[in-house]
Amino acid sequence: MQEVIAGLERFTFAFEKDVEMQKGTGLLPFQGMDKSASAVCNFFTKGLCEKGKLCPFRHDRGEKMVVCKHWLRGLCKKGDHCKFLHQYDLTRMPECYFYSKFGDCSNKECSFLHVKPAFKSQDCPWYDQGFCKDGPLCKYRHVPRIMCLNYLVGFCPEGPKCQFAQKIREFKLLPGSKI
């Protein structure tokens, strides 16, 4: 049985392209309908959606990075106007209040993030080098390091007080890594 199931990734189904292109989706009957339970519009994320407010899919901007804790319990009343994500995504779950406040959570089926305080303060060495395979599920902190544009063109008036990285060596490298 496993041989039959394991080989399916090589096959493409005729409807996959239609789903990807959102074919067969009609326009909303009127503007302003609550779409908080709908999927995110693939075309909007690429800047290509022409349906505007009549699109049946959500037009979420990048700021919706954390799942709405009220939506998880079915209590969010803001709908499309909520600043948080209305989609169940384990990689974007909010932090557990009880675990962060008391260091323990008694709910064995808690879906919120349980982040150990020791890991909150440690930067991820892999992210600092450029890529972390664990992504948002990483137990370490991901702090973006941005090169100073003034330094790149020759001179930064802020000098060592500049908040941006000014030398390649300011990016933390793992032992044995080369630039």
From Swiss-Prot:
In terms of superkingdom, the source organism counts as Eukaryota
Q: Which UniProt keywords apply?
A: Metal-binding, Repeat, RNA-binding, Zinc, Zinc-finger
Q: Which PROSITE patterns match?
A: ZF_C3H1
Q: Where are the zinc fingers (C3H1-type)?
A: 35-61, 62-89, 90-117, 118-145, 146-169
MF GO annotations: RNA binding; zinc ion binding
The record's section on InterPro entries has: CPSF4/Yth1 (IPR045348), Znf-CCCH_3 (IPR041686), Znf_CCCH (IPR000571), Znf_CCCH_sf (IPR036855)
Q: Known PANTHER family for this protein?
A: CLEAVAGE AND POLYADENYLATION SPECIFICITY FACTOR SUBUNIT 4-LIKE PROTEIN-RELATED, CLEAVAGE AND POLYADENYLATION SPECIFICITY FACTOR SUBUNIT 4-RELATED
Name of this protein:
Putative cleavage and polyadenylation specificity factor subunit 4-like protein
**Classification lineage:** Eukaryota, Metazoa, Chordata, Craniata, Vertebrata
